[in-house]
């Protein structure tokens, strides 16, 4: 959305909002507070920065304590698993929750938690891809903050039609995020990716 001078419109997600939505999931689940860790995406990537910033501002003033945060060198599942293994060694049972910047990274975190026998950790990740939906269905991931590409495409077509017809339209269109849980995963369209 920052490079608006290069396009007629933007239809996509607000990664800051994704971080804030993840923070709200933790606050809602742990009203009395909790200690959590964050496994970030590719260090320096726009989505990583905004998801982290949204998350940190989202938990500010709450009873959620961020024990540690570490970014990956890339959006690599094995990197997320290695970081989580290090967090487990360092913090052990103090970890009540994990915020991961992407669902496929959560796959590695789930494996690390399973190997450590830590079955009651509340795991929230972003993307809403097949891995996230499947992990939520299986109960190994608590929440997936879903990006609806269907809704992005629909809004993009509406903007393109308005542009071609000479009508006015919003230049920046942030698409609402889906909070995917075990309770609602079956009611949402299964992702193509």
Please give the residue ranges for each predicted region.
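A residue-level marker of the well-folded mature domains of exported/periplasmic proteins
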Residues: 1-193
């Amino acid at each position: 959305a920052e490079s608006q001078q290069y396009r007629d419109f933007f239809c996509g997600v607000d990664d800051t909002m994704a971080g804030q939505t993840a923070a709200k999931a933790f606050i809602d689940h742990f009203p009395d507070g909790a200690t959590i860790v964050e496994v970030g995406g590719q260090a320096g990537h726009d989505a990583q920065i905004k998801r982290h910033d949204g998350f940190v501002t989202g938990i500010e003033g709450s009873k959620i304590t961020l024990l540690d945060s570490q970014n990956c060198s890339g959006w690599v599942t094995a990197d997320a698993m290695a970081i989580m293994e290090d967090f487990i060694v360092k913090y052990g049972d103090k970890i009540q929750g994990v915020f991961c910047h992407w669902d496929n990274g959560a796959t590695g975190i789930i494996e690390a938690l399973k190997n450590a026998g830590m079955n009651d950790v509340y795991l929230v990740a972003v993307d809403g891809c097949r891995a996230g939906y499947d992990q939520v269905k299986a109960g190994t991931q608590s929440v997936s903050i879903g990006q609806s590409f269907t809704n992005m495409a629909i809004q993009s077509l509406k903007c393109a039609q308005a542009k071609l017809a000479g009508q006015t339209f919003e230049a920046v269109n942030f698409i609402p995020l889906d909070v995917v849980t075990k309770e609602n995963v079956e009611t949402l369209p299964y992702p193509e990716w």
